[in-house]
Amino acid sequence: MNEQKVLLPRKATVSRQTKETKVEISLDLDGTGESRIQTGIGFFDHMLTLMARHGLFTLEIEAAGDLEVDSHHTVEDVGIVLGQAIAKAAGEKYGIRRYGQIYVPMDEALALVVLDFSGRSYLAFEAELGQGRVGGLDVEMVEEFLRALADNAGITLHIRM
């Protein structure tokens, strides 16, 4: 019986609307790596596109927020909704290994990411990213995105860079 459950589609569509944002995300964990990302924040879109491509899941994100103020609400709410979509699509987690880890060397950076898909959320984030903006993304929002993602997906996430 468990083998059949692995074959069920692991997909989710989740939306969230607040005074500051409107976010809708569709996720297929067994996708192709294709994505359509529109948050209004160029570098954030780029990073989410790479997440889908390298994770081999299909991801659609449509987000509108109060970017004239700053990127905080949009970035955090995308993390919340993506985390909820991951939890919903994973369901009872059939076919998903609980633990995972990877080292990724990219240009001058070396990142270590370790996760536990335990149902208990926690973020340990050790990275000196500095301050400022990259492609419209406030650098300090990276940690807020990851925290919202971990909290809402129910994962323990350790990142060192």
Each language-model region and where it sits:
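N-terminal intrinsically disordered, cationic/polar leader segments
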Residues: 2-161
